[in-house]
Amino acid sequence: MTYTFIISDESVNADGFVIQTKGIRTERFKKDPVMLYMHAREKGVIGRWDNIRTEGSQLIADAVFDENNPLGKEVKERVDGGFLRSASIGLSVLNYERIDGVDTVTDCELTEVSIVDIPSNRNAVKLFDKRGLIVLSLKESADGDKDLRTQLIEVLKLPATATD
């Protein structure tokens, strides 16, 4: 069975900004297309992403779960059951601009894609009969890297204490 997800698009997410699909650099990610659960590196890799591609303004990928990993198997079962249907990207912002009154990431590097319970982009979902879209979290990554979080807070002009 193929598990195809829209992992990004150009809709305004819950954090109030847009990520331009053409500005997402995927070359490095394609060499190590890790799938995490809830952006938690400490839980390990639960799978990989294959067939990463752009269709119009959507970035799409196929999920391959590591069923030898207990969490990977559990997450796959939740996706099969329809209990988890969303994805979220982790990225490093390289450039952003205000376009048509909306903060817009115009250049970034994709670092990981996670299966998540609640995405900030309502369209970052598993594809069934309908097509959906992305997610980006302000949570600090498990490895303590705060660069993305800090950059996003600055871009969105949020207080330093902002959280998801």
For every predicted segment, state its role:
Residues 11-12, 41-43, 66-69:
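Short, charged/polar surface micro-motifs in flexible loops or helix N-caps
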Residues 1-32, 136:
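Polar/acidic, low-complexity leader/linker segments enriched in S/T/G and N/D
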Residues 2-4, 32-33, 50-145:
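Residue microenvironments linked to proteolytic maturation
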Residues 20, 85, 161-163:
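A diffuse structural propensity rather than consistent per-protein peaks
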Residues 18, 42-45, 103-104:
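Short, solvent-exposed loop/turn motifs
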Residues 134-163:
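N-terminal leader/targeting segments
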Residues 27-54:
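SsDNA-processing nucleotidyl-transfer enzymes
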Residues 13-14, 43-45, 96-97:
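Flexible loop/turn segments at secondary-structure boundaries
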